[in-house]
């Protein structure tokens, strides 16, 4: 046995000595990376430019050598045997034969080769993505020439099951961060913006103790432009807000209503009291016999002054603007009673109603003759005024074409006050009726005389409506008016009490009365001496004419209980009819 071992050792040494001494071929070996197997060799000192090389290979355990196609009699000094040795679980041998001109061939064989054990791992393919405060690293899979049973290429992760990645990040060679894992995506967080970092990625296989060369990437984090974005956003927002504000202000300016002129500033003018609106009712005549025909003629209305609302006993009487209404004027003389003292004359109310003891010139009343006097009513002095005496006077030469009365009684029912009237005040149980005797001439109206009828002599027609058309919004009131004398129970009574309570300023007589049946309906046929008063419009709520009969004093007393609507309308009112000549 010792002899056999000695012979084999000497023979091998002799063979190697023969190959090495030729100087044509040396350093035959496999170089494998990522399972790509390349056979390489070097020429010896005796090799020339015309030396050619041939390559053969075989699998471990086989006796027959296989020639590599494409690697026969070549002058280059490498041959790719990747496809011939792709089974990474097998062992292979390869040999190279060098032939020089005029010399014997020289052959050299490699050691046993296993790609799984002898292959090296290349650096991984990594992409480094810099961010403002982080760096992201993506590892791409590495493909190998090794084919699976189904024919697709295998990756390193599929061949080396224990493979993992090691990542390092260096900052100025003083600070480093480490990450490891089998995943393919990694990110280093918390970095400084606008700073350069050096990263390295290595593949490790613990079982075979393989380690790839590191992949090095130099990357710089992005600068922090957050403040720029914030500032830009704030500027854009401010500009948008400013544009919106300008548009809104422009819209408000365009749609703003114009400022009214100072001439329409009513509050500046009406400084004494707020503006009040009163309801007016105008009596419109529908027939005037004074004209040449029966058609309605233009009519001028006189000024009618109506006393204010009634006040409770003892209260100071004040006139209100809502109690007065002006409806036209006509050129006639002013009549007044003669028995009223001049110092007790009360001027018509002005725009600033005040209860004053002195007579003030009216600010809106027509001009009055020097001898004109107005009825004075002064309950403040506590005087008892005797009723004025009426004497028949001559017929007026000039009478108004027509007149109408408009009254807005804003007061409410209250206890009758103390009044001084131009009419005789009747005692309780007595009734005095005045009849109006009137004469109508073409284009002229004359008032005749006043006939005073005593008790028992009063006869009334069956139909005696109010001789003066009157409109009001106030319902009937059955209370009576009382004077300061306790024996005087009533102020106005009867259908003609209105005309009998009217005093014409500027003339000492009262309005003449005459018993005459006047119809308030404008549809009555036939002309009448009372055509002027017939033409006045009746109240809107007036019904048919109330039938009256001749009454004795007892009948007159019963009539006191049934007051007409006209009595209730003029209750508590001291009427003064004024014509301006």
Curated annotation (Swiss-Prot):
Expressed in kidney, liver and lung. It is found in: Cell membrane. The chain crosses the membrane at residues 231-251. Residues 18-115, 141-221 form the Fibronectin type-III domain. The modification Phosphoserine is found at residues 410, 414. Residues 1-15 form the signal peptide. SUPFAM superfamilies: Fibronectin type III (SSF49265). Induction: By LPS stimulation in the liver. There is a cross-link at residue 449 (Glycyl lysine isopeptide (Lys-Gly) (interchain with G-Cter in ubiquitin)). Residues 343-364 are annotated as: Disordered. GO terms for biological process: defense response to Gram-negative bacterium; negative regulation of inflammatory response. Phosphorylated by GSK3-BETA and MAPK; phosphorylation by GSK3-BETA stabilizes IL22RA1 by preventing its proteasomal degradation. One of its GO terms (cellular component) is plasma membrane. Residues 16-230 are extracellular. Coiled coil: none annotated. Changing residue 428 to R: No effect on protein degradation. Changing residue 449 to R: Degradation-resistant mutant. Keywords: Cell membrane, Disulfide bond, Glycoprotein, Isopeptide bond, Membrane, Phosphoprotein, Receptor, Repeat, Signal, Transmembrane, Transmembrane helix, Ubl conjugation. Residues 252-581 are cytoplasmic. Disulfide bonds join 71-79, 128-217. Glycans are attached at residues 80, 172. GO terms for molecular function: interleukin-20 binding; interleukin-22 receptor activity. Component of the receptor for IL20, IL22 and IL24. Component of IL22 receptor formed by IL22RA1 and IL10RB enabling IL22 signaling via JAK/STAT pathways. IL22 also induces activation of MAPK1/MAPK3 and Akt kinases pathways. Component of one of the receptor for IL20 and IL24 formed by IL22RA1 and IL20RB also signaling through STATs activation. Mediates IL24 antiangiogenic activity as well as IL24 inhibitory effect on endothelial cell tube formation and differentiation. Belongs to the type II cytokine receptor family. Heterodimer with IL10RB and with IL20RB. This is Interleukin-22 receptor subunit alpha-1. It comes from Mus musculus (Mouse). The gene is Il22ra1.
């Amino acid at each position: 046995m010792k002899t056999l071992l000695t012979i084999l050792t000497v023979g091998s040494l002799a063979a190697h000595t023969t190959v090495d001494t030729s100087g044509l071929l040396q350093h035959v070996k496999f170089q494998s990376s990522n399972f790509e197997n390349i056979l390489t060799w070097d020429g010896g000192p005796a090799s020339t430019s015309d030396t050619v090389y041939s390559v053969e290979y075989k699998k471990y355990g086989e006796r027959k050598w296989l020639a590599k196609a494409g690697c026969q009699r070549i002058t280059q000094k490498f041959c790719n045997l990747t496809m011939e040795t792709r089974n990474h679980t097998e062992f292979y041998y390869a040999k190279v034969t060098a032939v020089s001109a005029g010399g014997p061939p020289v052959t050299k064989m490699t050691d046993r080769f296993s790609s799984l054990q002898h292959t090296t791992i290349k650096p991984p393919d990594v992409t480094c993505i810099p961010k403002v405060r982080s760096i992201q690293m993506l590892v791409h899979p590495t493909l190998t020439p090794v084919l699976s049973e189904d024919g697709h290429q295998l990756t390193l992760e599929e061949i080396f099951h224990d493979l993992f990645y090691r990542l390092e990040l260096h900052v100025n060679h003083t600070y480093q961060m480490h990450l490891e894992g089998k995943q393919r995506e990694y990110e280093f967080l918390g970095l400084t913006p606008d700073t350069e970092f050096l990263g390295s990625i290595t593949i490790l296989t613990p079982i075979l103790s393989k380690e790839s060369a590191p992949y090095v990437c130099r990357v710089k984090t992005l600068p922090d432009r957050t403040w720029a974005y914030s500032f830009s956003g704030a500027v854009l927002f401010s500009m948008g807000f400013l544009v919106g504000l300008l548009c809104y202000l422009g819209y408000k300016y365009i749609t703003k209503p114009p400022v009214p002129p100072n001439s329409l500033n009513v509050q500046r003018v009406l400084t004494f009291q707020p503006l009040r609106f009163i309801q007016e009712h105008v009596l419109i005549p529908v027939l005037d016999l004074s004209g040449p025909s029966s058609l309605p003629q233009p009519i001028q209305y006189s000024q009618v002054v109506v006393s204010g609302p009634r006040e409770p006993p003892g209260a100071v009487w004040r006139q209100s603007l809502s109690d007065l209404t002006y409806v036209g004027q006509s050129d006639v003389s002013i009549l007044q009673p003669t028995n009223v003292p001049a110092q007790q004359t009360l001027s018509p109310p002005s725009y600033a109603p005040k209860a004053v003891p002195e007579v003030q010139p009216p600010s809106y009343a027509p001009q009055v003759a020097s001898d004109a006097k107005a009825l004075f009513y002064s309950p403040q002095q506590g005087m008892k005024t005797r009723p004025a005496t009426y004497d028949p006077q001559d017929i007026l030469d000039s009478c108004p074409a027509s007149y109408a009365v408009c009254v807005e009684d804003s007061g409410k029912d209250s206890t009758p006050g103390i009044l001084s009237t131009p009419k005789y005040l009747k005692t309780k149980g007595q009734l005095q009726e005045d009849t109006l005797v009137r004469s109508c001439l073409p284009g002229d109206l004359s008032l005749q005389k006043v006939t005073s009828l005593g008790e028992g002599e009063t006869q009334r027609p069956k139909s005696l409506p109010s001789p003066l058309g009157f409109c009001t919004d106030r319902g009937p009131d059955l209370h009576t008016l009382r004077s300061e004398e306790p024996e005087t129970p009533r102020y106005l009574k009867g259908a003609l009490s209105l005309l009998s309570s009217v005093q014409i300023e500027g003339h000492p007589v009262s309005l003449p009365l005459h018993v005459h049946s006047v119809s308030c309906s404008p549809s009555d046929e036939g002309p009448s001496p009372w055509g002027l008063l017939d033409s006045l419009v009746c109240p809107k709520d007036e019904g048919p004419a109330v039938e009256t009969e001749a009454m004795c004093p007892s009948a007159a007393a019963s009539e006191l209980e049934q007051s007409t609507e006209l009595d209730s309308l003029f209750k508590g009112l001291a009427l003064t009819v004024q014509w301006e000549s």
